[in-house]
């Protein structure tokens, strides 16, 4: 009986952009407490679960979350107080049924996710287990390759770059801690290079630099120069990744990219050319979420060569992932818990991807908090990849630091992910 939920409390806090988000605390009868806060995205998929905002322009420019807070402290608390926190499936089923909508629009996915994560943390604390072990079991040991965003563009930065994220993947590291060290060295070398060239070294939402450079190729060239300046190889030590966020520049069947209007076929050829010229092994949201034919074409062309990640295409939703698998769109799924709204549904999406030969990449959002749950999800699921921003801004570093703690705790049992070797 000591795992029974005794108290539920939610409050409004601020995320990394200074906008409100929800934080939830769950207390069990044995005194164990779990606390979780929920992130928020800037570029969002059309079919994501709803993030409930107050729309009261007199508070926080309409972005308050008091409605979500009230839902947790009222109807949700009434439902789950007295339930067993160790039965995550039952808790999440109750949340889904209480909401009763397909996209969590009644209670808000921010409310349901905050509760779902806090319950899991409370149960883990009650069992005196780290969250990754509680969620993943004894076989949990794989440390993820980080996809580290070191140049920001698109809606994450105020510059001319259309692509949203330019990432380094430290695939040649022996351990996660080494991966972070060598990536930090590249990050600081890039800062010095940008400064010498007269570019701004201010950072964007996710901690990457946001210089006002002119083209995708220039960004990639700068990153390769930074890798080599740090004493590493862009062939064996590091690979490159992109988050194109192409839905943000897609309209009426045309991609408005770098002052050119490109068809799906033309954009696919552009990607093929980039992959030939640069050590790119992962491209996210290369086509718009609405451009199914473009996705099929791209996957046919590059799907056996590099990782093609669907974010807006799948929004961590098993129904959409199943459709993508059936129609041969992409070969990897980005996993964002707040796109779906419960921990159970998050793990179901990961399992659906993995069981069908798709990779899974656990991800943050551009508006983050100091919450480190996604670090534990990445390890618990053995998915092998995590995307959680750059090597600046404490909201991003919190996740990396937590992963280094986990690796230290695992000791010799920790295994750095090698599942990206097929694309090298």
Curated annotation (Swiss-Prot):
<comment type="similarity">
    <text>Belongs to the enolase family.</text>
</comment>
<comment type="pathway">
    <text>Carbohydrate degradation; glycolysis; pyruvate from D-glyceraldehyde 3-phosphate: step 4/5.</text>
</comment>
<dbReference type="GO" id="GO:0005576">
    <property type="term" value="C:extracellular region"/>
</dbReference>
<feature type="binding site">
    <location>
        <position position="366"/>
    </location>
    <ligand>
        <name>(2R)-2-phosphoglycerate</name>
    </ligand>
</feature>
<keyword id="KW-0964">Secreted</keyword>
<feature type="active site" description="Proton donor">
    <location>
        <position position="206"/>
    </location>
</feature>
<feature type="binding site">
    <location>
        <position position="336"/>
    </location>
    <ligand>
        <name>(2R)-2-phosphoglycerate</name>
    </ligand>
</feature>
<dbReference type="InterPro" id="IPR020809">
    <property type="entry name" value="Enolase_CS"/>
</dbReference>
<feature type="binding site">
    <location>
        <position position="365"/>
    </location>
    <ligand>
        <name>(2R)-2-phosphoglycerate</name>
    </ligand>
</feature>
<feature type="binding site">
    <location>
        <position position="243"/>
    </location>
    <ligand>
        <name>Mg(2+)</name>
    </ligand>
</feature>
<dbReference type="InterPro" id="IPR036849">
    <property type="entry name" value="Enolase-like_C_sf"/>
</dbReference>
<dbReference type="GO" id="GO:0006096">
    <property type="term" value="P:glycolytic process"/>
</dbReference>
<keyword id="KW-0324">Glycolysis</keyword>
<dbReference type="InterPro" id="IPR029017">
    <property type="entry name" value="Enolase-like_N"/>
</dbReference>
<keyword id="KW-0479">Metal-binding</keyword>
<dbReference type="InterPro" id="IPR020810">
    <property type="entry name" value="Enolase_C"/>
</dbReference>
<protein>
    <recommendedName>
        <fullName>Enolase</fullName>
        <ecNumber>4.2.1.11</ecNumber>
    </recommendedName>
</protein>
<feature type="binding site">
    <location>
        <position position="284"/>
    </location>
    <ligand>
        <name>Mg(2+)</name>
    </ligand>
</feature>
<feature type="binding site">
    <location>
        <position position="387"/>
    </location>
    <ligand>
        <name>(2R)-2-phosphoglycerate</name>
    </ligand>
</feature>
<keyword id="KW-0456">Lyase</keyword>
<dbReference type="GO" id="GO:0000015">
    <property type="term" value="C:phosphopyruvate hydratase complex"/>
</dbReference>
<dbReference type="InterPro" id="IPR020811">
    <property type="entry name" value="Enolase_N"/>
</dbReference>
<dbReference type="InterPro" id="IPR000941">
    <property type="entry name" value="Enolase"/>
</dbReference>
<feature type="active site" description="Proton acceptor">
    <location>
        <position position="336"/>
    </location>
</feature>
<dbReference type="Pfam" id="PF03952">
    <property type="entry name" value="Enolase_N"/>
</dbReference>
<comment type="function">
    <text>Catalyzes the reversible conversion of 2-phosphoglycerate (2-PG) into phosphoenolpyruvate (PEP). It is essential for the degradation of carbohydrates via glycolysis.</text>
</comment>
<dbReference type="GO" id="GO:0000287">
    <property type="term" value="F:magnesium ion binding"/>
</dbReference>
<dbReference type="Pfam" id="PF00113">
    <property type="entry name" value="Enolase_C"/>
</dbReference>
<keyword id="KW-0963">Cytoplasm</keyword>
<feature type="binding site">
    <location>
        <position position="311"/>
    </location>
    <ligand>
        <name>Mg(2+)</name>
    </ligand>
</feature>
<dbReference type="GO" id="GO:0004634">
    <property type="term" value="F:phosphopyruvate hydratase activity"/>
</dbReference>
<keyword id="KW-0460">Magnesium</keyword>
<dbReference type="GO" id="GO:0009986">
    <property type="term" value="C:cell surface"/>
</dbReference>
<feature type="binding site">
    <location>
        <position position="164"/>
    </location>
    <ligand>
        <name>(2R)-2-phosphoglycerate</name>
    </ligand>
</feature>
